[in-house]
Amino acid sequence: MGETIRLTGVHETLLATLQARALDNRQPRPVLGDATAEELLRRIDYDFSRIRTATKDMRIVTFRARKLDEWAGRFLAVHPDAVVLHLACGLDSRAFRMDVPDTVEWIDVDVPDVIELRSRLYPERDGYRMIGASVTTEDWLDTVPRNRPALVVAEGLTPYLREADGEEMLRRVIRHLPTGAVMFDAVLPWTLRFAKYSQLLRATGATFGWGIGNPRSLESRVPGLRFQEQWSMLDSPFLADARPVEKWVGAGMRSIPQLRFAHRLLRYTF
């Protein structure tokens, strides 16, 4: 019998992300090659037909994860003594699939129910630990080192937050940490009106609450944050492996900024 899942709402969406990475691993040329995701899929007792993942969703998830892995790898190559905060980590295997220096302290953070599930699915390892807490609360930062460069990664988190909560979370994290980088995915504000048509959001009851327009607007609302770059999933070189119609649609969307950057990655330093 598999591990029983008791997650609802936004926390249930992590299972769709897991399914997307597992499906990618079965492709002739995987984007991420996350064999752990496929193993976890077999171990979990859950009706995945509720959140059936379409090919386009699989591509978004894996393009996003691959680019975040690349950005994180570049940061850790320069800062092998860093502390990594993976916020709303879900069941992601980033701490295990990346080539992480032994000197890095990696901390996965998510709500207690998710961390309890992770503790049953993932092994213990030196330099790795988990914190069970909502990332929008304050106390969990008390045990995070303040004397090391920090990498903050949030994947599939910010669109589900309220704007005030998301900005305060960033302010709190940056006040606590000395220097480093923040990288996360974000949606444009116009997408919030259409999120209700998402099959995944309808199935789980989750909602979108925060869209970020001009990435530089966060610099004035989160002191110390400095915008570096944005990257659209439509710019992934792996889109070349898509079906002809998907490549044609992608090319058309790339020519319109409001579509190209509707869902993209943002990278900041502080």
From Swiss-Prot:
<comment type="function">
    <text>Catalyzes as well the following side reactions: methylation of 8-O-methyl-TCM D3 to 9-carboxymethyl-8-O-methyl-TCM D3; and of TCM B3 to 9-carboxymethyl-TCM B3.</text>
</comment>
<dbReference type="GO" id="GO:0008168">
    <property type="term" value="F:methyltransferase activity"/>
</dbReference>
<comment type="pathway">
    <text>Antibiotic biosynthesis; tetracenomycin C biosynthesis.</text>
</comment>
<keyword id="KW-0045">Antibiotic biosynthesis</keyword>
<keyword id="KW-0489">Methyltransferase</keyword>
<dbReference type="InterPro" id="IPR029063">
    <property type="entry name" value="SAM-dependent_MTases_sf"/>
</dbReference>
<dbReference type="Pfam" id="PF04072">
    <property type="entry name" value="LCM"/>
</dbReference>
<protein>
    <recommendedName>
        <fullName>Tetracenomycin polyketide synthesis O-methyltransferase TcmP</fullName>
        <ecNumber>2.1.1.-</ecNumber>
    </recommendedName>
</protein>
<keyword id="KW-0808">Transferase</keyword>
<dbReference type="GO" id="GO:0032259">
    <property type="term" value="P:methylation"/>
</dbReference>
<dbReference type="GO" id="GO:0017000">
    <property type="term" value="P:antibiotic biosynthetic process"/>
</dbReference>
<dbReference type="InterPro" id="IPR016874">
    <property type="entry name" value="TcmP-like"/>
</dbReference>
<dbReference type="InterPro" id="IPR007213">
    <property type="entry name" value="Ppm1/Ppm2/Tcmp"/>
</dbReference>
